[in-house]
């Protein structure tokens, strides 16, 4: 009886181990089988929307892989990723948020790099004015900037105001946009006479009526900390060859030229993110 019982136990245990092994194999296989026909979902900081649309279109033509963009402030996208948003790649407007995602285990270590160096502009939709002097003299009702808690360009705008010793003088006139895109719209719509925006936005809107009637001051780089923008591969896409392929494409000469044509600074050796 004891031998029969032992034999049954061994068979039961062996069966359970077999089932467990098959289950684990199935899970591993499912994780490794990525649907490369599904859209690649990329979270993009608002300042980079115009060049990103061109780059996404070119990537789709080269690879056949569709791309879906989610455009918002870096802070908003960062929070969405932390709460499980289904993004494959994150293009932030700073280096801090991608690095924090790596530290939190939400992004792949070693995948982070600087794809652009942003520059700040003070824009007005009014023609034939000097935005710098208008700002210094306080001859405006409203000044639009992106929320510095969410958008690195908003933080850069705050730094510029400090450098210009205009923080107190402009405090009551500031209106905050959720992103640099909304700050731009505040100026374009006339809700604000002046706005700190990305140089790239001004260049992207170069043929629009709103810009052709406007005025711009490109701020000297010494008025704010460098806006080094990093990309990172998110953990959910670590086995997706298409996501890795896109990050390689973003570092290609074609991509670099496109990015620089939109007014972003060149990426020097010391401007690179973590590799």
Protein language model annotation of sequence segments:
Residues 26-62, 68-71, 75, 79-85, ...:
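Exported/periplasmic ABC-transporter solute-binding proteins
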Residues 11-25:
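Bacterial N-terminal signal peptides
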Residues 1-8:
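N-terminal secretory signal peptides that target proteins for export/translocation
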Residues 8-10, 141:
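Short, intrinsically disordered low-complexity segments
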């Amino acid at each position: 009886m004891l031998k029969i019982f032992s034999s049954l136990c061994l068979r039961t245990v062996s069966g359970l181990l077999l089932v467990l092994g098959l289950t684990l194999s199935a899970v591993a296989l499912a994780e490794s089988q990525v649907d490369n026909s599904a859209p690649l979902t990329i979270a993009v900081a608002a300042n980079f929307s115009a060049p990103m649309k061109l780059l996404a279109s070119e990537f789709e033509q080269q690879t056949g892989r569709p791309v879906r963009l989610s455009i918002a402030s870096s802070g908003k996208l960062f929070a969405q990723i932390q709460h499980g948003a289904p993004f494959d790649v994150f293009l932030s407007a700073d280096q801090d948020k991608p690095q924090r995602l790596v530290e939190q285990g939400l992004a792949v270590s070693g995948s982070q790099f600087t794809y652009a160096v942003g520059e700040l502009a003070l824009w007005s939709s009014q023609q034939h004015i000097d935005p710098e002097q208008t700002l210094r003299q306080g001859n405006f009702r409203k000044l639009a900037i992106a929320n510095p808690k969410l958008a690195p360009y908003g933080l850069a705008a705050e730094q510029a105001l400090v450098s210009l010793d205009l923080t107190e003088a402009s405090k009551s006139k500031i209106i905050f946009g959720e992103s640099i895109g909304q700050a731009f719209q505040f100026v374009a719509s006339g809700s604000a006479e002046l706005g700190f925006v990305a140089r790239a936005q001004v260049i992207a809107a170069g043929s629009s009526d709103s810009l052709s009637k406007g005025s711009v001051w490109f701020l000297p780089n010494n008025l704010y900390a460098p806006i080094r923008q990093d990309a990172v591969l998110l953990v959910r896409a670590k086995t997706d060859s298409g996501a890795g392929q896109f990050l390689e494409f973003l570092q290609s000469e074609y991509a670099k030229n496109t990015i620089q044509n939109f007014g972003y600074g060149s990426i020097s050796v010391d401007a690179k993110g973590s590799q």
